[in-house]
A protein has these predicted regions:
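Conserved G1/Walker A P-loop phosphate-binding module
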Residues: 2-103, 115-121
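Glycine-centered helix-boundary capping/hinge motifs
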Residues: 60-61, 145, 175, 186
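Helical mechanochemical/support elements of P-loop NTPase systems and associated helical scaffolds
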Residues: 70-77, 89, 101, 105-108, ...
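Conserved nucleotide-binding/hydrolysis micro-motifs of P-loop NTPases
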Residues: 71, 95-96, 128-132, 154-159, ...
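Conserved C-terminal guanine-recognition region of P-loop GTPase G domains, centered on the G4
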Residues: 79-85, 108-179
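Canonical P-loop GTPase G-domain recognition
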Residues: 156-211
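Extracytoplasmic
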Residues: 212-217
Length: 217
């Protein structure tokens, strides 16, 4: 199993930014303007109870049920936000511990991530308090070759344990951006979506299949 060296922290005094959430996700792009924005399809994926659906609700303004029992997210939920000049489609996939095709949820997720409608990027939400267990799924996503950004969620609870790990170093080792978040309040989401836009812009510059103007409804 993946293990991290933990040590008592000289933790940063302000580990998370505190943005005004309402200023982040502009939903004023209505009518024809929204239909001409480039679309970025992002799949939300993480272990059960990692805070993934809380992130979905905070970002999209949706009110999906959030609970601590199996089967809360039994199918993909979709929400939309407009940020950084893009129309972002958020797909909240079922919670899963792995991509091994054993359970119906795992088969559904793997087929979605590798099929013709696969997302442009995967936002992997992890419970920072259980980082080793959560990284198993992260490494499987990396093996699929999809662009990944990690939200280190519940970072406040992790810091309360007076532990710290060098997540910038881990990010460099894995080649995956990692951003601390507190999804239930929205803290860290501005930095997270800025990173997502940055990664998306850097993916194969000139690849027209990544961003396609919205031509639907």
């Amino acid at each position: 199993p993946f293990e991290l060296e933990r040590e008592p922290a000289e933790a940063p005094e302000e580990p998370l930014p505190a943005p005004e959430l309402h200023s982040l996700y502009h939903r004023e792009h209505s009518g024809l303007r929204s239909k001409t924005l480039p679309t970025l399809r992002i799949a939300l994926l993480g272990n059960p109870n990692c805070g993934k659906t809380s992130l979905f609700n905070q970002a999209s303004g949706a009110h999906e049920h959030v609970g601590n029992y199996s089967g809360v997210t039994i199918e993909a939920k979709t929400g939309y936000i407009y940020y950084g000049g893009y129309r972002i489609e958020l797909i909240d996939l079922p919670g899963s511990y792995s991509l091994s095709p054993y359970s119906p949820e795992e088969i559904y997720i793997r087929n979605y991530l590798t099929g013709s409608q696969r997302p442009d990027l995967v936002l992997n939400v992890v419970d920072t308090c259980n980082i080793e267990r959560n990284l198993y799924l992260t490494l499987q996503l990396k093996e699929l070759g999809l662009p990944v950004v990690v939200a280190l969620n519940m970072f406040d609870e992790f810091m309360q344990r007076e532990e710290y790990f060098d997540y910038p170093r881990l990010s460099r080792l894995l080649g995956i951006p990692m951003i601390p978040t507190i999804c239930r309040t929205g803290l860290g989401l501005e930095a997270l979506f800025d990173e997502i836009i940055s990664v998306a812009k850097g993916i194969k510059a000139g690849d027209e299949s990544l961003f396609s103007p919205e031509t639907g409804k």
